[in-house]
A protein has these predicted regions:
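Short, mixed-charge, low-aromatic patches
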Residues: 1-2, 16-20, 53-59
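Acidic, PIN/NYN-like endoribonuclease modules and their adjacent C-terminal/linker elements
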Residues: 2-8, 12, 33, 39-42, ...
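Short, charged N-terminal beta->alpha structural module
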Residues: 10-20, 24
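Structured helix-beta-strand junction loops
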Residues: 21, 48, 80-81
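Conserved BB-loop
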Residues: 24-36
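Acidic, metal-binding active-site segment of PIN/NYN-like and related structure-specific nucleases
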Residues: 38, 44-46, 50-65
């Protein structure tokens, strides 16, 4: 099971709940990346083999698409452990969204999933 990297915008209480559920979790603050740009956050998660989790759907959808397009253009592997985009909710609800997909058996590597209130987890098509 891959570890998790929580973006600055995800509450620390979510990290605590996920840790209590048995996940290996790091936060941007723990890594000293609280002011790092989004691309740096995603790169750090990819280098550590951790699934990246954020509320910032627009930025990370664009980064995910660019990651795949540029990797294909440059002839390199587009490897990251996955990106999960969640809406703002109570920490216990956010943790439930995350544990649900982590336990689903769905492929996460190099994929982006977004939680939709009317449909649950939806895979973003790879460009």
């Amino acid at each position: 099971m891959p570890g998790l990297h929580l973006d600055n915008c995800v509450a620390r209480q979510v990290a605590r709940l996920l840790t209590e559920a048995g996940y290996s979790v790091v936060t941007a603050a723990e890594l000293g990346l609280q002011r790092a740009p989004d691309g740096r956050q995603l790169l750090e998660a990819a280098q550590q083999g951790r699934v990246f989790i954020s509320h910032n759907a627009n930025h990370f959808t664009s980064l995910h698409d660019a990651w795949h397009l540029w990797s294909r253009s440059w002839g390199v592997a587009a490897l990251h452990a996955g990106i999960l985009l969640i809406p703002h909710a109570l920490p216990r609800v956010e943790a439930r969204y995350i544990t649900e997909i982590m336990a689903s058996g769905w492929p996460l590597a190099n994929e982006l999933y977004r939680w939709r209130p009317r449909g649950g987890w939806v895979r973003h098509p790879t460009p």
